[in-house]
Amino acid sequence: MGKLLLAVVCLFSVSAFASEKAFDLKMDLSIEGKHVSSPRIVVKEGEKGTITQESNGEKSFIEVVAKEDKAPNGKQAIHMAFVVGKIANDGTRTVVSQPQIISIPNEKAQITVGENGKPEVLSLSVIANKTTL
């Protein structure tokens, strides 16, 4: 009986100290050549995080799902799938871009979306780090 009780106590103490993988993302976002924001968010691995913001009367949003991955060179990396868009006054969301970035932890990664000869539609940079919750 004493061994069973000890096993149960150990099981609960291990789960009490278990932590969830998460990612701390520091971003810079520009839409149509205008700096929109520099948000920071911590997201659980595989779960969607959402940021909405308003600047100069214009609303925008960023959604992101992050997970551990490997870079092409085999190093540990963080894969981030974004949805970036604008929010109209009536609340309607318009997606501007859905970029994906694979980043080495604590190194800046950037993606710019646009067409040749035209102003950029979107520029998103991110510094991602692993953390726990």
Give the residues covered by each predicted segment.
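Outer membrane pore-forming secretion/assembly proteins and partners of Gram-negative envelopes
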Residues: 18-133
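Sec-dependent N-terminal signal peptides
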Residues: 4-14
